[in-house]
């Protein structure tokens, strides 16, 4: 059974179980972090795959095969094989077997890459990429300079988003689709993410309506309008995300790795 914890309360050091001298596994340029029980970060694997929301961990966890595998593995090991941590450094962390199965669900080629990397990590064969020659060292220095330049450019481009986050506490509610544009996300992507994470209702006549707990917390407002048609009356729902909700959701998206934190320039 998947459990959720608050990362700030339950993990004093996300890499507590890892020897500081040991190189963490890196796949496609993404560091695959672990929790102190040695479970692997599925969100990091998703980022390494380079694929969209349809291959996110939440989608895999909905499949019958994933549920059955988790149940059997937890019976066998007598431990929690998959957990979710909220807050800084959070995410969904899973037993190595589950992480490899998730990678296989993404693609067979990705499974092979992940499995070999985990084997190298477990057996201590994982080595940092140290330049072996002057040209390699120069190439590494150039790559680091390019990365620094790209980050600086992104900070300049994203500064309005950060300033927006500082203003929204007192702002009136906005439509979710408009908020997605402000964040630089696709409207459909944000709605899918909100449904996958249990914030919006996923099916039925109230699809895309916030669940009551999030309305009660003051994150959303809901307006119901009765519309008369030739086929009778129907209810239309208009959802707005409040200033409080905008700050809360931005933090959730940052914690999930959907948004990348940047610093505002003055």
UniProtKB/Swiss-Prot annotation:
Organism field: Escherichia phage P1
A GO molecular-function descriptor: DNA binding
Protein's UniProt name: Protein kilA
Keywords: DNA-binding
Alphabetical list of InterPro entries matching this protein: Ant_C (IPR005039), KilA/APSES_HTH (IPR018004), KilA_N (IPR017880)
Start-end of DNA-binding region: 176-195
Top-level taxonomic group: Viruses
Limits of the KilA-N domain: 21-121
Role, per record: Not essential for vegetative replication. Either interferes with plasmid establishment after transformation or is lethal to cells. May be related or lytic development of P1.
